[in-house]
Amino acid sequence: MSKQILILPGDGIGPEIMAEAVKVLKRIDAQHGLGFQLVYDELGGTAYDKYGSPLADETLERARGADAVLLGAVGGPQWDTIDPALRPERGLLKIRSQLGLFANLRPALLYPQLADASTLKPEVVAGLDLLILRELTGGIYFGQPRGNRTLDNGERQAYDTLPYSESEIRRIAKAGFDMARLRGKKLCSVDKANVLASSQLWRAVVEEVAKDYPDIALSHMYVDNAAMQLVRAPKQFDVIVTDNMFGDILSDQASMLTGSIGMLPSASLDANSKGMYEPCHGSAPDIAGKGIANPLATILSVAMMLRYTFARATAADAIEHAVGKVLDQGLRTADIWSEGTTKVGTVAMGDAVVAAL
């Protein structure tokens, strides 16, 4: 029986990078006889333009029925002035929560060919390979109450709420320990337990879960220190587990250790490893339509999809090796280009990866 993948190109550079990822997916499908069925729909700004909503009900049903979802990127300035509840990003938050995608995997891996692209000294980042596991469906982005009000003195005030339940923390902590077991057996839990009540519960529950993983070395770190340590000595980390907002910030920071966010894939998984896969970068409306966007993060997201949802590690390895081969050939999109390498566009980079397969 064929496996169904829902393709959501999204906004900005999304359709351009998705076209290259789909080329790679079709080639790997043909080579390995995977039998994927691809279904297309809209999410974000393009969905708002087409359906009047950033996530249409029928799109959500297609996502529920699919085995995996592959997303480009959402957002753009043309939707900045619409009702906040209908902005592209709300569609992304809704599909994550409705599909129960609570675990966001964001690797920060430095390809040796791109060591010069990092703004840090080569000796600080050489060999970097860490994974940030971000809780994705709780915390301050979803917490209620939230809103705006006018105080008695006429001053405007805005407020948000940062709640976490024991069960939400337990399941992401367990996922963190499981990932650490597959990697270097080190887990660092990042919180702000010196100030936040939610972080105090977070730390307590992580400690409880740790009792089931005696083989994993657990450490705790405050988020401000973690941000500093990521720049000072990033190779001390193997797996970092943290809440929604801290993970959002730290994973973007970690991405630049590698030289370009255009290289980094991500996976968002439910309890059964059904997932949505997308590049870590945004929709980059400033370069949309110019044919210069880096498709490698989206292509590597396909590899993550094959690995985590479909358990096809050999096919995933083939894509990752093909990306390495293309970098060995000196091909670079503008964001990772340096003197002595060959600058290519989005389509040429996608074609090169297909050829390397």
UniProtKB/Swiss-Prot annotation:
It is an enzyme of class 1 (oxidoreductase). The keyword NAD applies. The keyword Transport does not apply. Its EC number is 1.1.1.85. Its cofactor is Mg(2+); Mn(2+). Substrate binds at residues 96, 106, 134, 224. Pathway: Amino-acid biosynthesis; L-leucine biosynthesis; L-leucine from 3-methyl-2-oxobutanoate: step 3/4. Catalyzes the oxidation of 3-carboxy-2-hydroxy-4-methylpentanoate (3-isopropylmalate) to 3-carboxy-4-methyl-2-oxopentanoate. The product decarboxylates to 4-methyl-2 oxopentanoate. HAMAP family: LeuB_type1. Homodimer. This is 3-isopropylmalate dehydrogenase. It comes from Xanthomonas axonopodis pv. citri (strain 306).
